[in-house]
Each structure stands twice: as C-alpha cells, then as structure tokens.
Amino acid sequence: MKMVKFVKIIYKRIPFMKIDLHGIKHENVSRHLDVFFWEMMQKGVSQVEVITGISNRMKEIVKETCKDYNFEVIENKINIGSVFVKLN
C-alpha cells in the first residue's frame, strides 16, 4: 500500500512594492510613475502595486502610462482602489 503525504500549504500575502497616488495631481501622475517604475526595475522588481483610489481617471492615467512601456496592468480583485503592474 502506498503512503500518501498531505502537505499543508500556507498562503502568505506577498508584499508588493507599491506607490500611493493619493494627493498627486493628475497631470503629475505619469512623471511619478516613470520614476517609480525605473527605480523598481533597477532593483529587479517584476511586479508592483499602484494605489489609485477609486478615481477612474487616475486608473486611466496609470493604464495609459503602462501602455507606453508595454507593461501589463492587472485589476486587483480584492481592492478596487489599486492595480498590479507587471514590469517587463
């Protein structure tokens, strides 16, 4: 008879490097993201969280900026006030 081992997997929330755009004017968001993305890529970070709040315009600016870099934007299913960005 074969012995089957059961392994308990504990899922931990992996902390993401993040930027909080609260308080940043829409016209300055792209520049803040440019600097943040550059710093994260220099550190070898592959995915970040961008906190946008519930502003649809802020999310659109983030998506437009990410499109310029061909970065993938992933909606956060748990927190609608942020998105994840995969850095290439």
Label the model's feature ranges.
Residues 1-88:
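Long, charged, low-complexity intrinsically disordered regions
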